[in-house]
């Protein structure tokens, strides 16, 4: 028994009696039981929604394009995703909400790009900014889109500190204690040999375990005790006349000098400077009765997802890498729109094309670039011999 005829009318004979059939490519086809015509109907909006949803899932997933479309080459997926790269990525709204803590960090990516991230203490990514390196101007662009929080956690970048000093001078800064410990390990190594080095390493390791004000007070007392014991050690000097070879390597004059234990000094004065500025234990004192995050791990988790994306989808062009990273970041914003809502807004706005980041090309100098010359150069092994020069001077042949 065949399928019953529906009450839908045929577009050709205008009589009811259409039967639904399918096609190999998935399109819906109808067959009229009266005139025998086979009209078909497509839903571009439904097709686009399915492709766009698969596109976003591919960006956040670990499957290759060949695994997405079931082929070895992935050409079908690339063809279906080709228009998705042009959809503009929505920007996170500027809400003006004042957070207890904001985490700032930069992540260096391929194609000579760096992306600066800001994540709030409640979890969502608040904003991001593309740049070439972590400059103060780039961080100021990030800070301009947010209200000053109570505490901002940073890893110690010079550009970030300068931007905070100029833009948010009254905001309390919390230095990431993990980054402080890593800087100390770079100076001390993991197995210092001197007594001062071992004591500083113990202070650095204990710093990571401080969880309350009493432990912070004990740590600061131990730091003061270290200085009392190793004050003379830290001030020891080596004069150039005592070690001429090292002085030559350092570029010191014969009357010059340098600190003998400069790495130990660097670690101690790093502790002293950060403690004096209140950047070591701000997570305990900024909000009474509340313990905040003491590291930049929340924003480092987002950076890890970006690194994972680039590793799972190698070979992305510069433009596609930027788009993929921004789609990933948008998924971590507060209340991101669904794929259907994104496409609906995109169509209502006239389907605009995603704006590409312009490339800053180096301008030529007023004299212009150096042109190729024809003079012989020693680098090429081409120069006149002395005998030839003498013959040319005397006119002999």
Kindly give the residue locations of the regions a language model identified:
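Acidic/histidine-rich catalytic cores and adjacent linkers
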Residues: 29, 34-44, 51, 161, ...
């Amino acid at each position: 028994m065949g399928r019953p005829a529906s009450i839908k009318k045929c577009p050709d004979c205008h009589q009811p009696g259409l039967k639904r059939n399918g096609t190999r490519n998935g399109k819906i086809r109808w067959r009229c039981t009266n005139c025998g015509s086979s009209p078909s109907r497509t839903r571009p909006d439904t097709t686009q929604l399915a492709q766009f949803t698969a596109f976003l899932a591919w960006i956040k997933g670990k499957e290759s394009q060949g695994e997405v479309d079931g082929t070895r080459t992935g050409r079908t997926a690339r063809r279906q995703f080709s228009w998705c790269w042009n959809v503009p990525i929505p920007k996170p709204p500027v809400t003006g909400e004042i957070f207890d803590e904001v985490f700032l960090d930069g992540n260096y990516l391929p194609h000579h790009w760096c992306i600066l991230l800001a994540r709030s203490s409640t979890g969502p990514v608040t904003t991001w900014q593309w740049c070439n390196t972590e400059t103060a101007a780039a961080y100021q662009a990030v800070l301009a889109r947010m209200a000053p929080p109570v505490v901002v956690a940073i890893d110690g970048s010079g550009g970030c500190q300068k931007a905070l000093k100029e833009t948010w001078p009254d905001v309390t800064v919390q230095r990431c204690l993990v980054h402080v410990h890593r800087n100390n390990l770079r100076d001390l190594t993991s197995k210092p040999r001197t007594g001062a080095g071992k004591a500083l390493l113990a202070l650095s390791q204990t710093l990571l375990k401080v969880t309350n004000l009493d432990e912070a007070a004990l740590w600061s007392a131990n730091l003061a005790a270290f200085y009392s014991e190793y004050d003379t050690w830290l001030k020891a000097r080596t004069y150039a006349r005592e070690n001429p070879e090292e002085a030559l390597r350092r570029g010191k004059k014969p009357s010059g000098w340098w600190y003998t234990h400069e790495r130990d000094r660097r670690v101690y004065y790093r502790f002293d400077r950060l403690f004096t500025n209140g950047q070591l234990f701000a997570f305990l004192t900024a909000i009474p009765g509340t313990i905040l995050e003491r590291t930049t791990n929340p924003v480092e988790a987002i950076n890890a997802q970006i690194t994972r994306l680039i590793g799972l989808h190698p070979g992305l062009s510069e433009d596609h890498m930027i788009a993929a990273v921004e789609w990933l970041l948008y998924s971590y914003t507060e209340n991101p729109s669904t794929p259907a809502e994104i496409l609906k807004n995109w169509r209502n706005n006239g389907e605009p094309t995603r704006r590409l980041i312009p490339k800053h090309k180096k301008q030529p100098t007023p004299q212009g670039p150096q042109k190729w010359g024809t003079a012989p150069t020693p680098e090429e092994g081409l120069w006149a011999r002395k005998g030839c020069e003498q013959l040319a001077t005397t006119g002999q042949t």
